[in-house]
Amino acid sequence: MTNIRKSHPLLKIINHSFIDLPTPSNISSWWNFGSLLGICLILQIATGLFLAMHYTSDTTTAFSSVTHICRDVNYGWLIRYLHANGASMFFICLFIHVGRGMYYGSYMSMETWNMGIILLFAVMATAFMGYVLPWGQMSFWGATVITNLLSAIPYIGTTLVEWIWGGFSVDKATLTRFFAFHFILPFIIVALVMVHLLFLHETGSNNPSGLNSDADKIPFHPYYTIKDILGILLLFLFLISLVLFSPDLLGDPDNYTPANPLNTPPHIKPEWYFLFAYAILRSIPNKLGGVLALILSILVLALLPHLHTSKLQSLMFRPLTQTLYWILVADLLTLTWIGGQPVEYPFVIIGQLASVLYFAIILIFMPMAGMIEDNMLKMD
């Protein structure tokens, strides 16, 4: 008799996706982050659901309701900090996942890659709206500054901003709709993840060598399930340590002050995971130019398959492009640091140089290095 997991219509899908899935035998721990992202998403939806049971999306009570969750709800403080720091874990895994895709040339599977970029935008939008909900000073002013960027769009900008606000400033209507969107988007993300996996399983996983691995495949379970469980345990160890020892390490002290439209904080800045994009935005003096650079800083990833000049897919055997890749990583860390600094000398010029370098490496230097390496290997 056929095993039920191979015959049952529902179990068959799970079987083909997580059990009998043919997987390259040589994928490294960098391939663990996809499953870690799945775990992060489940954790965020679970903790978010419990927070939503006690949260009120009204400007007069939002801040108090978050305080009430931390003080009066059983383990409310734990749920709240798991959710806040879980978002940071989510983005750490996301950045590593995208970075691995760039390093090993996974972007050559274009459908999967483009779906990933859409997912990245969706997660960033969700995280931004989530940051507004506690209605602290940084929540309010962050929402004001970032939504106000849309006013840079010619002709329809101001109307668009007021339409998003639901009035003439960030107020009750804005908070209510942000809560509604923050609640629904993760479920849309789950659907997008399924499409992402559908595209991935059409082509199969890439591997560190960048070569075709059809001749050397092993079943996903038990080899990679056990490997993923180790990754999940390490992720939880890191997350629980952060939540229990220093839950506010990655937050902003200003967000413990209730939102006040009459008092602007000295430095308005988003959460740490948006700082690199914020630094690119600030490095351009023109408002519209800054907004375009901000969007392009993520959208440039969609160009990677078209900018791939080498005959080798992975960077494993390409020392020149490898060097550029790690310079790019250092550059992104520099941008993250600059995004959290005040707008003054020398931070402005460092931010501008780092922004130019970011786009130059991706659009110019990496494609050039690919051609040089091909030439050195005489692969023509």
From Swiss-Prot:
Key words, A-Z: Electron transport, Heme, Iron, Membrane, Metal-binding, Mitochondrion, Mitochondrion inner membrane, Respiratory chain, Transmembrane, Transmembrane helix, Transport, Ubiquinone
Matches recorded under CDD domains: cytochrome_b_C, Cytochrome_b_N
Cofactor(s) needed: heme b
Record-linked InterPro entries: Cyt_b/b6_C (IPR005798), Cyt_b/b6_C_sf (IPR036150), Cyt_b/b6_N (IPR005797), Cytb/b6-like_sf (IPR027387), Cytochrome_b (IPR030689), Cytochrome_b_C_euk/bac (IPR048260), Cytochrome_b_N_euk/bac (IPR048259), Di-haem_cyt_TM (IPR016174)
Residues involved in heme b b562 binding: 83, 182
Membrane topology (UniProt): Multi-pass membrane protein
GO MF annotation terms: metal ion binding; ubiquinol-cytochrome-c reductase activity
Keyword Transmembrane helix among UniProt keywords: yes
Membrane-spanning residues: 33-53, 77-98, 113-133, 178-198, 226-246, 288-308, 320-340, 347-367
One Pfam short name: Cytochrome_B
Signal peptide: none
Cofactor note as given: Binds 2 heme b groups non-covalently.
GO terms under biological process: mitochondrial electron transport, ubiquinol to cytochrome c
Residues the entry annotates as binding heme b b566: 97, 196
UniProt subcellular location: Mitochondrion inner membrane
Superkingdom as given in the UniProt entry: Eukaryota
Cellular component per GO, a single term: respiratory chain complex III
Binding positions for a ubiquinone per the UniProt entry: 201
PANTHER family registered for this protein in UniProt: CYTOCHROME B
Miscellaneous comment: Heme 1 (or BL or b562) is low-potential and absorbs at about 562 nm, and heme 2 (or BH or b566) is high-potential and absorbs at about 566 nm.
Family: Belongs to the cytochrome b family.
Subunit organization: The cytochrome bc1 complex contains 11 subunits: 3 respiratory subunits (MT-CYB, CYC1 and UQCRFS1), 2 core proteins (UQCRC1 and UQCRC2) and 6 low-molecular weight proteins (UQCRH/QCR6, UQCRB/QCR7, UQCRQ/QCR8, UQCR10/QCR9, UQCR11/QCR10 and a cleavage product of UQCRFS1). This cytochrome bc1 complex then forms a dimer.
Role: Component of the ubiquinol-cytochrome c reductase complex (complex III or cytochrome b-c1 complex) that is part of the mitochondrial respiratory chain. The b-c1 complex mediates electron transfer from ubiquinol to cytochrome c. Contributes to the generation of a proton gradient across the mitochondrial membrane that is then used for ATP synthesis.
Protein name as it appears in the record: Cytochrome b
Organism: Eliurus minor
Gene that encodes it: MT-CYB
